[in-house]
Amino acid sequence: KWWPEVSKTLNILRITGGEPLLHKTTWKTFDDLIENPKPQIEININTNMGYTPRRMEKLVDYVTKMRDNNSIKAFKMFSSMDTWGDRAEYLRTGLDIETWEKNQDIYLRGVQSHITHMVTFNILSVTSFKSFLVKILEWRKTYEDIIPNNLGTDENVRKIRFDTPYLKEPIQY
C-alpha cells in the first residue's frame, strides 16, 4: 500500500533478510519495477547466496530486464562472508561453500557488476581471514576482465569488494 507513494521519491531501496530472494514480495517488487520503471532507484540487496543456482539465474534475468528497460538506476549485491572453506561452513549454519561460489559466479558473469562481501569478525574467523583474502585475489583475477568498467574511465574498479565495518560500541553510548 505504501510502495506506490514512497517509490516516487525513493533513491535507494535496500532489501535485507532473512533471505530476500526466498520471499515472494521481493520478486513482486521487481515485477512492479519492470512494469512501472523508477529510473532514480538504486537497489541494494543483502543475500547469503545459499539457495539453488536456478534462483540466482532468475535474479540475473530480473536484473537484466530491469537494466534493459531502464527500470532502475543500479543494482548492487552484498553478501556476508568472513573466511573461507570448512571454517566458513562451520561459522555460517547451512552454508554450502560450493553452492555459494557457484551462485557468485552466475551473478558476476550474468549481471556483470561488482559484489561486496560484508565481513563480520569473530574469534573463529579472524584467525583464518587470510584464506578469504587469498580467495578474493583469486576471484579478482578471474572476474576483473569479465566485468566492464561502467565509469567511462580507464580507472581500475574492483569488481570483488569486501567491507570490514568497524564499530567500537553502539552509537547511543
Residue ranges and their predicted role:
Residues 32-37, 110:
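Short, acidic, metal-binding catalytic loop of nucleotide-sugar glycosyltransferases
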Residues 123-139:
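Catalytic cores of alpha/beta
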